[in-house]
């Protein structure tokens, strides 16, 4: 079975974010980067299916040369080879344009199964994987939390609202978007890191008409949420003093009594 996993590089969760002067995105110059969380789980699920059924895992990522760090980590964890869609501003593409570029990069692979994360940790659109499935004419399921793959079909458990779940059966080839927490992600071993150095990373460039196509959406503004609440310690650890101070504030500021 050939499995293609789509992986996106995003800013590290612990990074201190600064908004660019246009107010449309963050300054990326000094940031550290990592793989989007749910994409990491998609890779782990692909490796588990490969261990069960055999085959090949191909990872595909899009972005500038720094994306190679995500690709190499995936290869070290067990992916067999990689496709890098190279471009400096591809992270700003609309979901439709991104899906079009990614489909063009992997179409000749004729995969049996495509796995993506449910949504990226930056934009969080949750649309790219589904659009890819539509462009490829594949059945798809979203928010997958359990995957049971056999020779020519899948059984997929989907997470719904309010603690409900849903089982789907579908033929292959198919596309799934994977929820975070579906399994325990493995770490790259020293042996895997050394082996990754010999694995193929194929670079492709998206077509100009894909990158430059008109978009039907744009980000007007991003901003940091304003703090509207604050915590104040009353009484300095003394219960009676705290109660008295609270009563005074309720009277003078909240005008409760």
Residue locations for each model-derived region?
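N-terminal glycine-rich FAD/FM-binding segment characteristic of electron-transfer flavoproteins
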Residues: 1-257
């Amino acid at each position: 079975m050939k499995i293609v996993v789509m992986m996106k590089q995003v800013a590290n969760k612990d990074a201190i974010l600064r908004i660019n002067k246009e107010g449309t995105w963050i300054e990326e110059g000094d940031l550290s980067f990592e793989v989007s969380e749910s994409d990491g789980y998609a890779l782990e699920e692909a490796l588990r299916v490969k261990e069960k059924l055999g085959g090949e895992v191909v990872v595909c990522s899009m972005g500038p040369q720094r994306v190679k760090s995500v690709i190499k980590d995936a290869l070290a964890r067990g992916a067999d080879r990689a496709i890098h869609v190279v471009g400096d501003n591809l992270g700003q593409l609309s979901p439709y344009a991104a899906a079009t570029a990614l489909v063009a990069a992997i179409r000749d692979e004729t995969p049996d199964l495509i796995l993506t994360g449910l949504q990226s940790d930056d934009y969080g659109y949750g649309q790219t994987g589904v659009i890819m499935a539509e462009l490829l004419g594949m059945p798809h399921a979203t928010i997958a939390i359990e995957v049971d793959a056999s020779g020519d079909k899948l059984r997929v458990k989907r997470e719904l609202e309010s603690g409900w779940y849903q089982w789907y059966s579908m033929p292959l080839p198919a596309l799934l978007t994977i929820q975070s927490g579906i399994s325990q992600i493995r770490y790259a071993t020293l042996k895997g890191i050394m082996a990754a150095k010999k694995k193929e990373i194929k670079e492709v460039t998206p077509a100009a008409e894909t990158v430059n196509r008109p978009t039907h959406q744009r980000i007007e503004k991003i901003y940091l949420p304003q703090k509207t609440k604050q915590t104040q310690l009353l009484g300095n650890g003394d219960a009676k003093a705290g109660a008295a101070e609270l009563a005074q504030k309720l009277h003078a500021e909240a005008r409760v009594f």
